Amino acid sequence: MVSLLAFTSCASEYKIEGSSSVSRLDGKMLFVKVPSGDRMLSIDSAEVIHGMFKMEGITDSTSMASLYMDDESIMPFVIEKGKISISIDNARIVVTGTPLNDRLYDFVGKKTSLDDRAYELERQESRMIMDGKAPDEIQREITREREKLAAEMNALAKEFIQKNYDNVLGPGVFIMLCSNFQIGRASCRE
Protein backbone atom coordinates (compact mmCIF):
# COMPACT_ATOMS: atom_id res chain seq x y z
CA MET A 1 0.00 0.00 0.00
CA VAL A 2 2.80 2.43 0.89
CA SER A 3 4.59 1.74 -2.42
CA LEU A 4 1.36 2.38 -4.34
CA LEU A 5 0.97 5.74 -2.59
CA ALA A 6 4.59 6.60 -3.31
CA PHE A 7 4.10 5.79 -7.00
CA THR A 8 0.95 7.85 -7.36
CA SER A 9 2.48 10.83 -5.58
CA CYS A 10 5.26 10.98 -8.22
CA ALA A 11 2.87 10.53 -11.14
CA SER A 12 1.21 13.43 -12.93
CA GLU A 13 -2.03 13.42 -14.86
CA TYR A 14 -2.14 14.77 -18.39
CA LYS A 15 -5.19 15.43 -20.49
CA ILE A 16 -5.03 15.97 -24.25
CA GLU A 17 -7.93 17.62 -26.06
CA GLY A 18 -7.50 18.01 -29.78
CA SER A 19 -9.32 19.38 -32.76
CA SER A 20 -8.64 19.00 -36.46
CA SER A 21 -10.11 20.60 -39.55
CA VAL A 22 -8.23 18.09 -41.73
CA SER A 23 -11.02 15.83 -43.00
CA ARG A 24 -8.73 12.89 -43.80
CA LEU A 25 -8.05 12.51 -40.06
CA ASP A 26 -11.71 11.71 -39.27
CA GLY A 27 -12.06 8.07 -38.31
CA LYS A 28 -8.29 7.65 -38.00
CA MET A 29 -6.47 6.54 -34.89
CA LEU A 30 -3.87 8.89 -33.44
CA PHE A 31 -1.14 7.58 -31.18
CA VAL A 32 1.06 9.31 -28.63
CA LYS A 33 4.54 7.80 -28.78
CA VAL A 34 7.58 8.46 -26.62
CA PRO A 35 11.19 7.45 -27.21
CA SER A 36 12.15 4.16 -25.59
CA GLY A 37 15.66 3.06 -26.44
CA ASP A 38 15.95 2.99 -30.22
CA ARG A 39 12.21 2.91 -30.95
CA MET A 40 9.02 4.85 -30.29
CA LEU A 41 6.67 3.32 -27.72
CA SER A 42 2.92 3.99 -27.96
CA ILE A 43 1.54 5.17 -24.60
CA ASP A 44 -1.92 6.41 -25.59
CA SER A 45 -4.32 6.55 -28.53
CA ALA A 46 -7.63 8.02 -29.62
CA GLU A 47 -9.89 7.99 -32.64
CA VAL A 48 -10.64 11.29 -34.36
CA ILE A 49 -14.42 11.68 -34.40
CA HIS A 50 -15.97 14.72 -36.09
CA GLY A 51 -12.62 16.49 -35.88
CA MET A 52 -12.16 15.92 -32.14
CA PHE A 53 -10.01 13.60 -30.06
CA LYS A 54 -9.23 13.16 -26.36
CA MET A 55 -6.67 11.26 -24.37
CA GLU A 56 -5.71 11.23 -20.74
CA GLY A 57 -3.32 9.32 -18.62
CA ILE A 58 -0.64 9.35 -16.00
CA THR A 59 3.02 10.00 -16.63
CA ASP A 60 5.82 9.51 -14.15
CA SER A 61 7.96 12.21 -15.75
CA THR A 62 7.84 15.02 -18.26
CA SER A 63 8.94 13.77 -21.68
CA MET A 64 9.08 14.64 -25.36
CA ALA A 65 6.45 12.81 -27.36
CA SER A 66 5.12 12.72 -30.90
CA LEU A 67 1.60 12.42 -32.21
CA TYR A 68 1.42 9.72 -34.87
CA MET A 69 -1.12 8.65 -37.46
CA ASP A 70 -0.21 5.12 -38.51
CA ASP A 71 3.60 5.18 -38.77
CA GLU A 72 3.78 8.88 -39.67
CA SER A 73 4.87 11.37 -37.03
CA ILE A 74 2.56 14.36 -37.29
CA MET A 75 4.04 16.58 -34.61
CA PRO A 76 6.20 16.77 -31.50
CA PHE A 77 4.92 17.93 -28.12
CA VAL A 78 5.62 17.53 -24.42
CA ILE A 79 3.76 15.13 -22.17
CA GLU A 80 3.51 16.96 -18.87
CA LYS A 81 1.03 17.55 -16.07
CA GLY A 82 -1.97 19.56 -17.18
CA LYS A 83 -4.42 20.06 -20.01
CA ILE A 84 -2.74 19.95 -23.42
CA SER A 85 -4.68 21.48 -26.33
CA ILE A 86 -3.78 20.39 -29.87
CA SER A 87 -5.08 22.16 -32.97
CA ILE A 88 -4.39 20.71 -36.43
CA ASP A 89 -5.32 22.34 -39.72
CA ASN A 90 -3.96 22.23 -43.26
CA ALA A 91 -1.51 25.06 -42.65
CA ARG A 92 -0.16 24.43 -39.18
CA ILE A 93 -0.22 22.54 -35.93
CA VAL A 94 -0.28 24.24 -32.54
CA VAL A 95 0.01 22.79 -29.05
CA THR A 96 -0.80 24.95 -26.02
CA GLY A 97 -1.99 24.74 -22.45
CA THR A 98 1.08 23.66 -20.52
CA PRO A 99 4.26 25.63 -19.84
CA LEU A 100 6.69 23.57 -21.93
CA ASN A 101 4.28 23.16 -24.86
CA ASP A 102 3.62 26.91 -24.86
CA ARG A 103 7.37 27.50 -24.93
CA LEU A 104 7.93 24.86 -27.65
CA TYR A 105 5.25 26.23 -29.95
CA ASP A 106 6.39 29.83 -29.45
CA PHE A 107 9.74 28.59 -30.82
CA VAL A 108 7.95 26.70 -33.60
CA GLY A 109 6.13 29.88 -34.64
CA LYS A 110 9.39 31.82 -34.86
CA LYS A 111 11.11 28.99 -36.75
CA THR A 112 8.19 28.72 -39.18
CA SER A 113 8.44 32.45 -39.87
CA LEU A 114 12.14 32.05 -40.73
CA ASP A 115 11.36 29.00 -42.89
CA ASP A 116 8.75 31.04 -44.77
CA ARG A 117 11.29 33.80 -45.37
CA ALA A 118 13.76 31.22 -46.73
CA TYR A 119 11.09 29.89 -49.10
CA GLU A 120 10.30 33.43 -50.26
CA LEU A 121 14.01 34.02 -50.88
CA GLU A 122 14.03 31.11 -53.35
CA ARG A 123 11.05 32.65 -55.14
CA GLN A 124 12.83 36.01 -55.19
CA GLU A 125 15.84 34.39 -56.86
CA SER A 126 13.59 32.96 -59.59
CA ARG A 127 11.96 36.36 -60.13
CA MET A 128 15.37 38.03 -60.41
CA ILE A 129 16.41 35.51 -63.07
CA MET A 130 13.16 36.04 -64.99
CA ASP A 131 13.67 39.82 -64.76
CA GLY A 132 17.04 39.43 -66.48
CA LYS A 133 19.31 40.56 -63.65
CA ALA A 134 22.99 39.73 -63.95
CA PRO A 135 23.83 36.27 -62.53
CA ASP A 136 26.67 37.55 -60.35
CA GLU A 137 24.41 40.28 -58.90
CA ILE A 138 21.73 37.67 -58.15
CA GLN A 139 24.32 35.40 -56.55
CA ARG A 140 25.68 38.17 -54.30
CA GLU A 141 22.27 39.37 -53.15
CA ILE A 142 20.77 35.92 -52.57
CA THR A 143 23.90 34.63 -50.82
CA ARG A 144 23.89 37.65 -48.49
CA GLU A 145 20.22 37.07 -47.61
CA ARG A 146 20.71 33.30 -47.15
CA GLU A 147 23.61 33.92 -44.78
CA LYS A 148 21.54 36.44 -42.83
CA LEU A 149 18.65 33.96 -42.51
CA ALA A 150 21.00 31.13 -41.52
CA ALA A 151 22.50 33.33 -38.80
CA GLU A 152 19.01 34.20 -37.51
CA MET A 153 18.00 30.52 -37.47
CA ASN A 154 21.20 29.50 -35.69
CA ALA A 155 20.73 32.26 -33.10
CA LEU A 156 17.09 31.27 -32.54
CA ALA A 157 17.95 27.58 -32.10
CA LYS A 158 21.00 28.26 -29.92
CA GLU A 159 19.10 30.62 -27.61
CA PHE A 160 16.16 28.21 -27.29
CA ILE A 161 18.35 25.19 -26.56
CA GLN A 162 20.45 27.13 -24.03
CA LYS A 163 17.36 28.47 -22.23
CA ASN A 164 15.93 24.94 -22.06
CA TYR A 165 19.03 22.87 -21.32
CA ASP A 166 17.56 21.93 -17.93
CA ASN A 167 14.32 20.43 -19.28
CA VAL A 168 13.25 18.06 -22.07
CA LEU A 169 12.95 20.84 -24.66
CA GLY A 170 16.66 21.62 -24.96
CA PRO A 171 17.84 18.13 -25.90
CA GLY A 172 14.57 17.30 -27.68
CA VAL A 173 14.70 20.28 -30.05
CA PHE A 174 18.44 19.81 -30.56
CA ILE A 175 17.86 16.23 -31.73
CA MET A 176 14.92 17.25 -33.96
CA LEU A 177 16.92 20.04 -35.62
CA CYS A 178 19.95 17.79 -36.15
CA SER A 179 17.76 15.11 -37.76
CA ASN A 180 15.96 17.66 -40.00
CA PHE A 181 12.59 16.84 -38.41
CA GLN A 182 9.98 19.24 -39.83
CA ILE A 183 8.83 21.08 -36.72
CA GLY A 184 5.49 22.84 -36.96
CA ARG A 185 4.55 22.05 -40.55
CA ALA A 186 1.34 20.16 -41.05
CA SER A 187 2.36 16.75 -42.32
CA CYS A 188 -1.17 15.40 -42.47
CA ARG A 189 -2.41 17.42 -45.41
CA GLU A 190 -5.23 16.21 -47.59
Regions found by a protein language model. Give the residues of each.
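Short coil/turn linking the two alpha-helices of tandem helical-hairpin repeats
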Residues: 178-181
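Sec-dependent bacterial lipoprotein signal peptides
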Residues: 1-8
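A non-transmembrane, solvent-exposed segment enriched in polar/low-complexity residues
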Residues: 10-154
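Amphipathic alpha-helical repeat scaffolds of TPR domains
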Residues: 166-176
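N-terminal alpha-helical segment
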Residues: 153, 169-170, 185
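Residue-level detector of conserved catalytic or cofactor/ligand-binding positions
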Residues: 183-190
